[in-house]
Amino acid sequence: MSLDQYLPIFLFILVGIGVGVAPQVLGYILGPNLPDSAKNSPYECGFEAFGDARMKFDVRYYLVAILFILFDLEIAFLFPWAVALKDIGALGFWSVMVFLTILVVGFIYEWKKGALDWE
């Protein structure tokens, strides 16, 4: 497999980065920069902020978000495995079973530790 086959992928990545970065750079360069106290103050639905604009969230929100990302990533790994199951054979099957076992053991550990309880 030669590197010429990766050229379209490389160009796709470059165009994607360019589409994301170019408007931000152009806005920064061409946009007016006129700061004043009204623009720099926190704003909530037409009222001045009632409390601290940077309130702390409970750690459980972050834990649930990390668990969601972990198991969402697991599904992202399982889709290509399911498509190529005929081609990868028994070794591929059992390696994914080990992967799933590790994830299930981790999930049971978190459940037993009470990480998923909202008391």
Curated annotation (Swiss-Prot):
The keyword Cell membrane applies. The keyword Membrane applies. It is a multi-pass membrane protein. Pfam families: Oxidored_q4. One of its GO terms (cellular component) is plasma membrane. Belongs to the complex I subunit 3 family. It is found in: Cell inner membrane. Keywords: Cell inner membrane, Cell membrane, Membrane, NAD, Quinone, Translocase, Transmembrane, Transmembrane helix, Transport, Ubiquinone. InterPro entries: NAD(P)H_OxRDtase_bac/plastid (IPR023043), NADH_UbQ/plastoQ_OxRdtase_su3 (IPR000440), NDAH_ubi_oxred_su3_sf (IPR038430). Its EC number is 7.1.1.-. The chain crosses the membrane at residues 9-29, 63-83, 88-108. Disulfide bonds: none annotated. NDH-1 shuttles electrons from NADH, via FMN and iron-sulfur (Fe-S) centers, to quinones in the respiratory chain. The immediate electron acceptor for the enzyme in this species is believed to be ubiquinone. Couples the redox reaction to proton translocation (for every two electrons transferred, four hydrogen ions are translocated across the cytoplasmic membrane), and thus conserves the redox energy in a proton gradient. Its main location: membrane. GO terms for molecular function: NADH dehydrogenase (ubiquinone) activity; NADH:ubiquinone reductase (non-electrogenic) activity; quinone binding. This is NADH-quinone oxidoreductase subunit A. NDH-1 is composed of 14 different subunits. Subunits NuoA, H, J, K, L, M, N constitute the membrane sector of the complex. It catalyses: a quinone + NADH + 5 H(+)(in) = a quinol + NAD(+) + 4 H(+)(out).
